[in-house]
Amino acid sequence: MQTTQMEYHNPVLLMPTVDGLAIKPDGVYVDVTFGGGGHAREILKRLGPKGKLIAFDQDKDALENTIDDSRFVLVNENFRFLKRFLRFHGHKEVDGILGDFGVSSHQFDVAERGFSTRFEAELDMRMDQGSAFSAYDVVNNYDESQLASVLFQYGELRASKAMARVICEAREKEPIKTSEQLKETMGRFLPKHREHKILAQIYQAIRIEVNQELEVIKEFLQQALEVLKPDGRLSLISYHSLEDRLVKRFMRNGMFEGEPEKDMFGRVEVPMKPVGKFIIPDAAEIKENNRARSAKLRVAKKL
C-alpha cells in the first residue's frame, strides 16, 4: 500500500472512530471525508484481502493523497451523492460509514482558500473549488434579511441583524472582497477579548452557507440509513452544535425534528441505535492538535 500525502493534520479521534465501525475483514466500508487519508489508512489496515473501502472527497487537493491499494477507491465528489456513486461502483449495501465533518487543516492553512481568519485572502471558502458560488457572493449579493438569517442560524450571533446592516452599508461604497475588509467592516462587533471567537462564528456562518453544509449532512444521513446493512455502523465526528444536533437526533430516532410516531401500543420503532456515549479527545490529543478541541464522536448501528 503506497501513499502520496500532502500536509494534513493527524486524523482526529483516529482509533475510537475506526473502532466504532467494528470492522469485518471482508466488509465494505465508506470514508465520506477522505482528506489526508488518515482514517482511510487505518480502515485498510484492518481489512482483509476481500475487504473494500470507498472514499469520498469533493476537494481536488485531497486527490494528491492517493492510496495505491486494490481494495480502495477514491471518489472526487460530495458525499451528498453517496448512494449514487456506491451503486456506480457496484455496492447497494455497506457494513459501515465514517465521516469527519471538520474543515481540514490543509484547507485552513492554505491562505488563498479563505477558510482561516488568520490570513489576508479573497473571500472564498469553497470546499469544492469547481463551484461558482463563494463567500464573496454571500457577503456582497445577499440582501440584509438573508445575511442576518445566515449569521443568526449558522453563526448563532446575537447581533446578526446589526452585523448584516453594517455589511450592506459598507458594500454600497465598495465591494467587500477580502478577509481583511470583512474584518474591518465588523470591527465594532469585535471586542479585543472576544475578537477571535466572534470572527470565527462569522466565518463559520458564511462557510456553512457557501457549502450548504447542514443540508448536505441531512441528505447524507438519510442515504446512509438506506445503504447500511442491518447492524451496519455509522461513526461520525462533528465540530459544532449545529452539526452535532443533527447527528444526535438522527442516530436516536432517524429524524431531524419532532418525535417518531408511536403505534397503538405506545411503542416506537426507530431505525438506528446509538452505541455507547459520545467521545471527545483527551488532553494529550488536544495539545498535539488544537483543532481537535471541539470534536465530538458519535457512533450508531442500524437496527
PLM features per residue range, with description:
Residues M1-L303:
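S-adenosyl-L-methionine-dependent methyltransferase catalytic core, i.e., the SAM/SAH-binding region
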